[in-house]
Amino acid sequence: SPIRSMLRCDGYDEGWGTYAQLYSYNYLEFKNTDRETTSLLQQLYRDNDILSLSLSSLSDLYVNYENYTLDNLCEYLSGYGIAEDNARSIYEYVVENPTTYLSYSIGWYKLEQLRNTMEEELGSHFDIGEFHEAVLSCGSCPFSLLEERVSTLMTE
């Protein structure tokens, strides 16, 4: 509808993008590796992205809520092996675009939570394709509506 095209639900939009990106690592293949090594590498790529996104989201909170200075943030991020130049880039980004990283991380987390809930609820009847179809059929919307709608679609 025209009104929905004007409303933004960044958590859904960016969360779905992040969810899809992280899910895509399930299809990542490596030459000359056995199945177990491939699975471990897929998980490593996924975990690395989650860690990077989490650190960026925490940086946003520390700068915009806890009033971290550039020096504070550099010191904090250095504990994770992040160079001063990279910390400066993150600092400048979160100052100019507060809460942006949070829409990615919290949006992804909410979708991951919803998937886990549906998997637990449906057990062996859970179908990942049906879950993805249910999420996408809702379109960009607040998570309260998404959770209700996906639950209804998946349990029909």
Write out the residue ranges for each language-model feature.
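N-terminal maturation segment of proteins
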Residues: 1-156
